[in-house]
Amino acid sequence: MYFRMAKRVISETDKRLVWKFLWNMGIKGTRSVYKHRQRLKRDEFFPPFLYISIINSCNLRCQGCWVDVAEKQHKIDVPAMDRLIGQAKEVGNSFFGILGGEPFMHSEILDIFANHPDCYFQVFTNGHFISDEVARELRRFGNVTPLISIEGNEIVSDERRGGPGGVYSQSMEGLHHCLEHKLLTGVCTSLCQTNYDDMLQESWLDKLIDLGVFYAWFHIYRVIGPEPNGQLALTPEQQLEARRFVVEMRA
């Protein structure tokens, strides 16, 4: 599986983007883990990777999201992000996960990526704000992998994500912009009762591969957020089945 994925990455993406990924995420990421382990031996703790919520605003109202998007907008400005990333780089970090709300609602998110070409960023996004122009900029930077959340078909997406309609199609449009510009792009899904049978299928992964997606994440719906719904949570048996499925698909 890993050989096939490596072959796809080399043949289907921009070679400069592959090099950025291998250097900033692969080699330097491995180094950051090594330095983290050395710190632990000295009873010092600083994680090898940071996941940062840069804004609480979002255009959707997804069930299971821990962010209350109805609150007043809060965001981390560029100077603060530069300081945070700079301090992390001082101890050897180079990989950062960027979360929201919806990260691309941060008006200066592209400046953050541009200011740190020696780092690699994974952005958790619904894809609605990734236009052709934005995707073109991400390709120019070469240090970003968009991870686009798709929660089910058109009906399930609209019901679960609280948008005005067309949630699925807008996410797919953002996904296509990323793939057209040969970005190393992934898709993530929060598994719950309304999408479990549809999304936890090899046919869904085959569709993503056919589209040009390079990796997929599944995570489990948690009963959290402003309007938690316990009826959406997976049973222990379903969680175990999901884990088995992921392990089998990796083989």
Feature locations, PLM:
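A short, mixed-charge helix-start or loop-turn motif at secondary-structure junctions
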Residues: 51, 66-67, 156-160, 186, ...
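Short glycine-enriched, charge-decorated loop/helix-capping segments at active-site entrances
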Residues: 68-75, 159-166, 231-234
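A C-terminal junction/extension of Radical SAM enzymes
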Residues: 221-251
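A generic "alpha-helical surface" signal
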Residues: 79, 169, 237-240
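A short, flexible beta-alpha/helix-coil linker loop
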Residues: 68-72, 153-156, 223-226
